[in-house]
């Protein structure tokens, strides 16, 4: 019996989740999986409004946990990976965070800290380095991490805070620097089965697959930290 699965996924998973679905469908070729990518905050807001998702794969633990704590879903949140923050550019060489202080840098992209955990982590880095007051006017915010990436990719921003998982290793112009994990709180990413997903057997099958050795290897390949 072919089944349908609707997933709400954080934008930093745009590349990795497509690879994971491709792998999953080798064993489940008849099942249809549709994914809505957005910031964790926006997806959370849609789920509270009863959006018909079966699984919510977030960039934080807070929002999935809230869904359980507020009894919006009977399932508990499960951490699946830790995200890695980078500073990157499409045409400038980046080998340290010193470039943030360069007066030639006029626009810095990051995800909206209120909606996206990677944006929150980016602000923590600037706060930690005491650079926030001086750089505030240069920051342009993307609604999600992938929109912040677009700003850099289209050169609307010279540099940006991004997710290691979205870095295209084949792009020869791209340069990125992995930010010291001591500068931001861990980006612990969790998922949760929604109330809708309770009636969809495929939700459990796909969720279990995400914790399989095969899936863990794919997460690693895309730069996530998996224990």
Features from the language model and the residues they span:
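Exported/periplasmic ABC-transporter solute-binding proteins
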Residues: 2-27, 32, 36-37, 41, ...
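Active-site acidic carboxylates
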Residues: 76-78
């Amino acid at each position: 019996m072919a089944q349908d699965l609707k997933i709400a996924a954080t934008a930093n998973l745009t590349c990795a989740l497509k690879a994971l679905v491709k792998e999953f469908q080798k064993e489940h070729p008849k099942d249809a999986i549709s994914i809505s990518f957005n910031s964790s905050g926006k997806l959370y807001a849609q789920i509270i409004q009863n959006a018909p998702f079966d699984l919510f794969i977030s960039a934080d633990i807070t929002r999935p946990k809230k869904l359980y704590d507020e009894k919006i879903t009977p399932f508990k949140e499960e951490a699946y990976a830790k995200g890695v923050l980078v500073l990157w550019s499409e045409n400038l060489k980046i080998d340290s965070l010193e470039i943030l202080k360069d007066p030639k840098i006029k626009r810095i992209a990051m995800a909206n800290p209120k909606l996206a955990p990677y944006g929150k982590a980016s602000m923590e880095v600037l706060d930690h380095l005491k650079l926030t007051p001086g750089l505030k006017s240069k920051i342009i915010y993307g609604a999600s991490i992938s929109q912040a990436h677009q700003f850099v990719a289209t050169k609307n921003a010279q540099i940006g805070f991004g997710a290691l998982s979205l870095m295209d290793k084949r792009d020869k112009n791209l340069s990125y620097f992995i930010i010291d994990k001591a500068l931001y709180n861990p980006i612990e990413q969790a998922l949760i089965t929604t109330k809708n997903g309770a009636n969809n057997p495929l939700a459990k099958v796909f969720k279990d697959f995400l914790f399989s050795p095969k899936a863990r290897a794919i997460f690693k390949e895309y730069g996530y930290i998996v224990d």
